[in-house]
């Protein structure tokens, strides 16, 4: 009897070819598109995998391949678990990655649960990554896709063993050009469809405007720009509009190439400094998930990535706080260690695990020195004779 697999079809070339490859491999395929765009999105809104046109593309591909296709309403679930999370973290001075959250909670938790109702024990997506089971330990492993330019293992680091055991990534052994060529051979209209480069629920990538429109009653409180010595050198618009490493859009000329080196949430301050000050060698991470190992018991040398686009860098990870957090110490300074972003650990092509960056341990927030108020002419300063 054929095994049934639910394929998450976004209307793009990757998920379309995923469905085709699984058919060729002898699976019974059910195509599913998740309806997750916000309820208040305009009818013609485009947002990558969330747009209405993407659903139509997925339907057409499923029809051409001869597989059933369903649209599942995940709006409320996505709203609560991804969009609200994104806003909450930004308002708290963090820089979250909503795609990582979506992968774990929506695609590989919510969709897996729905797949059982459709008679499928497994799901498949068009991610460029690999899964295999270690014959010695029995653990499921997550590996880089062979196309280094498209590898998505970083954004999948928080998958559980259960999720990995029930997931297929057919594209992990292919390059993107090979997938486009395969789509063309199959006569799929999406063969040349461009990749989505946006956060799906923020089509124009303007997250600042998104926050202002979504939280109109929230006071984006202005506060001080301060230098590394704590001197107040300007006024910012509100912490959610800045992120570590940012140079453009600061809104103030400082007389030198200025970068955001930290957000001081307690004092509502943005710390500014030169490019060199953005770098650090040590960070603290928590909210850990381990894949290749059951847990970290002793220091381990790995390659670590502190953002999706970063190159892996040699580091030693050491457990702290009874193993609920790790200190990551890099061999060389890393630029823009950003609280809220993921740090992912590799050995060779395989993901060891990862977590969420709490803070740059090499950075000490300055004590803010507010300027003395200027005396008003003709008025004696209080306490003086």
Swiss-Prot record:
Signal peptide: none annotated. Catalyzes the 2-thiolation of uridine at the wobble position (U34) of tRNA, leading to the formation of s(2)U34. Its EC number is 2.8.1.13. HAMAP family: tRNA_thiouridyl_MnmA. This is tRNA-specific 2-thiouridylase MnmA. One of its GO terms (biological process) is tRNA wobble position uridine thiolation. GO terms for molecular function: ATP binding; tRNA binding; tRNA-uridine 2-sulfurtransferase activity. It catalyses: S-sulfanyl-L-cysteinyl-[protein] + uridine(34) in tRNA + AH2 + ATP = 2-thiouridine(34) in tRNA + L-cysteinyl-[protein] + A + AMP + diphosphate + H(+). The gene is mnmA. It is an enzyme of class 2 (transferase). InterPro entries: MnmA-like, MnmA-like_C, MnmA-like_central, MnmA-like_central_sf, Rossmann-like_a/b/a_fold. Disulfide bonds join 102-200. Belongs to the MnmA/TRMU family. The active site is at 102 (nucleophile), 200 (cysteine persulfide intermediate). GO terms for cellular component: cytoplasm. ATP binds at residues 8-15, 34, 126. The record marks 127, 341 as: Interaction with tRNA. Its main location: cytoplasm. It is found in: Cytoplasm. Keywords: ATP-binding, Cytoplasm, Disulfide bond, Nucleotide-binding, RNA-binding, Transferase, tRNA processing, tRNA-binding. It comes from the Bacteria.
């Amino acid at each position: 009897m054929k095994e049934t697999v639910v394929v998450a079809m976004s209307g793009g070339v990757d998920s379309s070819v995923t469905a085709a490859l699984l058919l060729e491999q002898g699976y019974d395929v059910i195509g599913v598109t998740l309806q997750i765009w916000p309820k208040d999105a305009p009818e013609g809104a485009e947002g990558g995998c969330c747009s209405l046109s993407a659903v139509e593309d997925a339907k057409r591909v499923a029809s051409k391949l001869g597989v059933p296709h369903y649209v599942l309403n995940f709006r409320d679930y996505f709203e609560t678990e991804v969009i609200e999370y994104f806003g909450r973290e930004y308002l708290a001075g963090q820089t979250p990655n909503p795609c990582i959250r979506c992968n774990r909670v929506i695609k590989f938790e919510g969709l897996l649960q729905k797949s059982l109702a459709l008679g499928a024990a497994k799901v498949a997506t068009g991610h460029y990554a690999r899964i295999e089971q270690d014959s010695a330990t029995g653990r499921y492993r997550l590996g880089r896709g062979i196309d280094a330019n498209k590898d998505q293992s970083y954004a999948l680091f928080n998958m559980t063993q259960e999720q990995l055991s029930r997931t297929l990534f057919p594209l992990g052994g292919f390059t993107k050009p090979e997938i486009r060529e395969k789509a063309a051979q199959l006569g799929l209209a999406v063969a040349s469809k461009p990749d989505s480069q946006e956060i799906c629920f923020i089509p124009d990538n303007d997250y600042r405007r998104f926050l202002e429109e979504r939280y109109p009653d929230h006071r984006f409180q202005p506060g001080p720009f301060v230098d590394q010595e704590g001197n107040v050198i300007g006024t910012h618009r509100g912490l959610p509009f800045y992120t570590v490493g940012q140079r453009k859009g600061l809104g103030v000329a400082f007389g030198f190439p200025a970068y955001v080196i930290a957000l001081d949430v307690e004092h509502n301050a943005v710390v500014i400094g030169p490019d060199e000050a953005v770098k650090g060698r040590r960070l603290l991470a928590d909210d850990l998930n381990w894949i290749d190992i059951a847990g970290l018991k002793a220091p381990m040398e790995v390659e670590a990535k502190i953002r999706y686009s970063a190159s892996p860098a040699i580091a030693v990870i050491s457990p702290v706080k009874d193993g609920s957090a790790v200190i990551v110490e890099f061999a060389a300074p890393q630029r823009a260690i950003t609280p809220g972003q993921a740090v992912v650990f590799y050995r060779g092509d395989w993901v060891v695990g990862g977590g969420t960056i709490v803070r740059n341990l090499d950075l000490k927030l300055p004590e803010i020195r507010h300027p003395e108020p200027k005396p008003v002419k003709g008025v004696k300063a209080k306490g003086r004779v």
